[in-house]
C-alpha cells in the first residue's frame, strides 16, 4: 500500500508541473493573441482603403479593365495557397483547414495535374508531401507577428505563377479568426481579381484625369493589390493560430487540474485504507495477547 501511495504522490507532483507549464503557455498565447488582433485590425483598415482605391480606379472608365489579373480564363489548373502552423499544440487548427482542402480537391479534381499546392507552414507542407502531393513552394518559420517582408517570397511567387499561367486561378486556404474560441476554415478565391462579388460601388475617381493612363497604373497596382489581400489572409490565419493555441493550453490546464483532483481523492482513499488496515492489525495483535 505504501508503494501505491508513493506512486500516486509522484503522479500528482508530475501533473502539477505539467499544469504549470500549460498555464504559462496559455498566458503566452493570450499575449500573442492580443498583439495579433491589434495587428489584424490595423491591417483591415489599410486593406479597406487599398480596396476602395483599386475599385475606384478599375471603375473609372466605362470600358472594362483589360488587365490579365482580372480576366477569367479557362481553368486547366488550380493553385492552392494553404496556411498552417509550423508546430502543434494548437488543437484542431491544422486538421480543420487540411481536411477542408483535401475534401475540396477530391470534389473538384480527378488527377494531380489539375492542381498545385503552395504551403505556408511546416505542418501543411509535411502533410501534403507525406501523401505524395506536389508542393511547388514551401515557406516555414514564420514569426508570431509576421511582416510582409517575411511572406513576400511566397506571396510574390503565387502572383507570379498566376501571371505566368502556371495555374489559372488561386485559392487561399486558411482559418479565419472569429473570436478566441471560434475559427472557421475558409477557401477564398484571390485570382483572378474580381470586385463584383463584394458589392463595391461605382468609383469616385471617374472625375479625375489619370496619368499616364488607367491600364498602365493597373499593371502596377493589381499585383500589389493581390499581394496585400493574400497577406491579409496570412495575418488573419496567424491570429486564429494564437487563439487556437491559447484555447488548447487552457483545455490542457483544466484537464490537468481535473486529474490532480481525481488523484488527490484516490490518494486520500488509499491513505485511509492504509490507516484502517494498520489499526485492524494492531487490534488483532492486542486481542491475540
Swiss-Prot record:
Protein name from the UniProt record: ATP synthase gamma chain
Cited Gene3D superfamilies: 3.40.1380.10, ATP synthase, gamma subunit, helix hairpin domain
Gene designation per UniProt: atpG
Function: Produces ATP from ADP in the presence of a proton gradient across the membrane. The gamma chain is believed to be important in regulating ATPase activity and the flow of protons through the CF(0) complex.
Subunit comment: F-type ATPases have 2 components, CF(1) - the catalytic core - and CF(0) - the membrane proton channel. CF(1) has five subunits: alpha(3), beta(3), gamma(1), delta(1), epsilon(1). CF(0) has three main subunits: a, b and c.
Organism of provenance: Lactococcus lactis subsp. cremoris (strain SK11)
GO CC, one annotated term: proton-transporting ATP synthase complex
InterPro entries: ATP_synth_F1_ATPase_gsu, ATP_synth_F1_gsu, ATP_synth_F1_gsu_CS
GO MF annotation terms: ATP binding; proton-transporting ATP synthase activity, rotational mechanism
Membrane topology: Peripheral membrane protein
Principal localisation: membrane
Amino acid at each position: 500500500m505504501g508503494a501505491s501511495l508513493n506512486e500516486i504522490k509522484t503522479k500528482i507532483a508530475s501533473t502539477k508541473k505539467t499544469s504549470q507549464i500549460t498555464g504559462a503557455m496559455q498566458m503566452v498565447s493570450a499575449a500573442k493573441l492580443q498583439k495579433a488582433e491589434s495587428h489584424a485590425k490595423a491591417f483591415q483598415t489599410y486593406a479597406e482603403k487599398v480596396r476602395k482605391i483599386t475599385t475606384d480606379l478599375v471603375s473609372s472608365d466605362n470600358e472594362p479593365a483589360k488587365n490579365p489579373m482580372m480576366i477569367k480564363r479557362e481553368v486547366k489548373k488550380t493553385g492552392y495557397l494553404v496556411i498552417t502552423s509550423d508546430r502543434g499544440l494548437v488543437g484542431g487548427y491544422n486538421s480543420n483547414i487540411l481536411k477542408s482542402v483535401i475534401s475540396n480537391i477530391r470534389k473538384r479534381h480527378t488527377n494531380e495535374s489539375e492542381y498545385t499546392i503552395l504551403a505556408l507552414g511546416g505542418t501543411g507542407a509535411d502533410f501534403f508531401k507525406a501523401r505524395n502531393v506536389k508542393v511547388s513552394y514551401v515557406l516555414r518559420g514564420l514569426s508570431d507577428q509576421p511582416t510582409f517582408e517575411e511572406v513576400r517570397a511566397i506571396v510574390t511567387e503565387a502572383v507570379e505563377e498566376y501571371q505566368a499561367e502556371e495555374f489559372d486561378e488561386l485559392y487561399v486556404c486558411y482559418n479565419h479568426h472569429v473570436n478566441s474560441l471560434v475559427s472557421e476554415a475558409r477557401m477564398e478565391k484571390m485570382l483572378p481579381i474580381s470586385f463584383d462579388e463584394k458589392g463595391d460601388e461605382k468609383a469616385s475617381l471617374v472625375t479625375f484625369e489619370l496619368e499616364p493612363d488607367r491600364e498602365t497604373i493597373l499593371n502596377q497596382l493589381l499585383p500589389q493589390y493581390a499581394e496585400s489581400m493574400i497577406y491579409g489572409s496570412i495575418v488573419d490565419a496567424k491570429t486564429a493560430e494564437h487563439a487556437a493555441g491559447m484555447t488548447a493550453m487552457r483545455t490542457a490546464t483544466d484537464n490537468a487540474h481535473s486529474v490532480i483532483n481525481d488523484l488527490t481523492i484516490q490518494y486520500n482513499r488509499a491513505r485511509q485504507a492504509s490507516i484502517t488496515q494498520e489499526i485492524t492489525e494492531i487490534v488483532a495483535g492486542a486481542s491475540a495477547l
